[in-house]
Amino acid sequence: MRGRDEETGEFHDKSRSQNRRDALDVLALGEKLVSLTPAQLARLPIPEDLLPHIAECKRITAHIAHKRQLAFLAKHMRREEEATLDAIRDALDANSETGRREVAMMHRVEDWRERLLAEGDKALAALLDDYPQADRQQLRTLVRNAQAEKAKNKPPRAYREIFQVLRALMLPAALGLKASAEDADPVESDEADED
């Protein structure tokens, strides 16, 4: 039973409507968790006792049975601390934000690739202004090869390679990291020494 504070007249506990809204929020969170891949689930701070329930919910595909299993998962999730559920929500939000940034970065890479193929050296100069660490000669050669492949109706090998080079160039900047060729070389040489 809910009680009232005699002095202020306010209720001590949540209303029944608020409890329902909270339960629906937890159910929606459970649906999101069930829709994730195992690799994505591994990155989230999910308590070990919830993992079997998530796996069971993924396994069941019949509509009503799946819905019932989701409700069962939500019941177990409501037993967890609110801080645990908030941590899961925050991690999901961070993952979705990272995904949106990666998609936006891929679109920028595709735009630059199309611009390089359409405008040539003019676009290359603009790219080098934004990314001075880019290899001018490599990009110029790839653009020339991609244009030749397109003219001869050959497979777009250089076209794809331009994408890979631009992605490697823009990814560290998009994620806020500083990377250079010198940073990558020691890792490769260490791995070569171990073999």
From Swiss-Prot:
According to its UniProt record, where is this protein mainly located? cytoplasm
GO biological process terms on file: assembly of large subunit precursor of preribosome
Keyword vocabulary terms for this entry: Cytoplasm, Ribosome biogenesis, RNA-binding, rRNA-binding
Q: Does the keyword 4Fe-4S apply?
A: no
Instruction: Tell me any Pfam family this protein matches.
Output: DarP
One example of the protein's molecular function in GO is: ribosome binding
Cleavable signal peptide = none
Residues forming coiled coils: none
A single GO CC term, please? Answer: cytosol
Q: Which domain of life is it from?
A: Bacteria
Location comes to:
Cytoplasm
Output the PANTHER family linked to this UniProt entry: UPF0307 PROTEIN YJGA
Family per record: Belongs to the DarP family.
Function according to Swiss-Prot or TrEMBL: Member of a network of 50S ribosomal subunit biogenesis factors which assembles along the 30S-50S interface, preventing incorrect 23S rRNA structures from forming. Promotes peptidyl transferase center (PTC) maturation.
Read off the HAMAP family from this record: DarP
Q: What is this protein called?
A: Dual-action ribosomal maturation protein DarP
Per the UniProt record, the source organism is Stenotrophomonas maltophilia (strain K279a)
As recorded in Swiss-Prot or TrEMBL, the protein's gene is named darP
